[in-house]
């Protein structure tokens, strides 16, 4: 049996000193760094661990070069972050451009021109929260967040975010967990573009126009564009909210009172995320990924959001990730967030 231990190629380095008013206190905080001189061995282990197959030696060499770039990026992020960890994962041999093409799928261009949402109510989320909101809250604690799924190499994040939102709202209303079909949205939604991208608000519109959405079992996910199938649509929507997020304080209240929210972010800085609260997540690549906001809290004086991704449970914190709150991490404040409204019969 082969055992893979990337950590044997890691150096543990001192990170930061903490200074009190009159006393010097040294904080034992460390970060990890991969030994770049062992990049080839790390790559060989990576290829075997993740069953990577390349068409020829030329492609393998090109992937190794990308792997080294990602390795350097992981080291840089671990040196920068004192509350999160980044490490080699199954995506360590793809570039940022490939990530955007294959593993995201938010398509902002669908909101341009004359297209307008007919069923989603435009709602501005601004100002401070009104009423009492708990300091921390997570819908997973109420079992109202369904299992993490895998979108594969298909730009269908919009479908996964929208479906996850509906599944959560259904559980909140009925205390019943459902597994709904993302593939039906990929195949049948005529406004969004299947594996070539879409928006969560348009997904809700498509479900309303079609009369509902099917279960996963009769319409399983394939990760490729297919022909729309005529299956029974079990869950119906009566409307949706198209959120313009301007206040993270108010967003906290919306999340707590109404349920998980489909949000748009720039995910590139989190490609190799493993755990913890990422403090440094830019929007340099533009909004490109749809995920589900499920909770918030505070750890070691760092306020954070908790979000559900669609890259499988082996990524991040069992498929979830945390980013710093109240600093517009990953560009979370934008006008592309959305949430469904279940019909009275659903």
Swiss-Prot record:
Q: How is it modified after translation?
A: Synthesized as an inactive proenzyme and activated by proteolytic removal of the inhibitory propeptide.
Using the UniProt record, name the top-level EC class of this enzyme in a single word: hydrolase
Q: Which residues form the active site?
A: 157, 289, 309
Intrachain disulfide bonds: 154-195, 188-228, 281-330
The positions flagged as glycosylation sites are: 175, 230
EC number of the protein: 3.4.22.50
Zinc-finger is among the record's keywords = no
Listed Pfam families: Inhibitor_I29 (PF08246), Peptidase_C1 (PF00112)
**What is this protein called in UniProt?**
Viral cathepsin
Query: Organism source for this protein?
Result: Xestia c-nigrum granulosis virus (XnGV)
């Amino acid at each position: 049996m082969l055992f893979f231990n990337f950590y044997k190629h890691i150096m543990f380095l001192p990170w930061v000193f903490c200074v009190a008013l009159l006393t010097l206190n040294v904080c034992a905080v460390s970060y990890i760094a991969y030994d770049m001189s062992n990049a080839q061995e790390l790559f060989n282990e990576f290829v075997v661990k993740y069953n990577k197959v390349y068409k020829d030696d030329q492609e393998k060499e090109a992937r190794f070069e990308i792997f080294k770039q990602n390795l350097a990026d992981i080291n840089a992020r671990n040196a920068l972050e004192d509350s999160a960890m980044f490490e080699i994962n199954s995506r360590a041999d793809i570039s940022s451009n490939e990530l955007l093409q294959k593993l995201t799928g938010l398509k902002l261009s669908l909101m341009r021109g004359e297209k307008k949402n007919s069923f989603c109510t435009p709602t501005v989320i601004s100002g401070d929260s009104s009423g009492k909101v708990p300091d921390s809250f997570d819908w997973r604690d109420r079992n109202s967040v369904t299992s993490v799924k895998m979108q594969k190499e298909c730009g269908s994040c919009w479908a996964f975010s929208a479906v996850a939102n509906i599944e959560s709202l259904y559980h909140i209303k009925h205390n019943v967990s459902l597994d709904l079909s993302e593939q039906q949205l990929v195949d049948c939604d005529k406004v969004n573009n299947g594996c070539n991208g879409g928006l969560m608000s348009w997904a809700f519109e498509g479900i309303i126009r079609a009369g509902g959405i099917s279960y996963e079992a009769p319409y399983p996910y394939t990760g490729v564009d297919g022909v729309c199938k005529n299956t029974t649509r079990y869950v119906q929507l009566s409307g949706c909210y198209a959120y313009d997020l301007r206040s993270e304080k108010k967003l906290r209240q919306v999340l707590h009172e109404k349920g998980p929210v489909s949000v748009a972010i720039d995910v590139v800085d989190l490609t190799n995320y493993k755990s913890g609260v990422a403090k440094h997540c830019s929007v340099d690549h533009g909004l490109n990924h749809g995920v589900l906001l499920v909770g918030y809290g505070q750890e070691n004086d760092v306020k954070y959001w908790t979000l559900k991704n669609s890259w499988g449970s082996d990524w991040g914190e069992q498929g979830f990730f945390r980013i710093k709150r109240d600093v517009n991490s990953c560009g979370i404040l934008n006008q592309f967030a959305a949430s469904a409204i279940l019909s009275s019969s659903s």
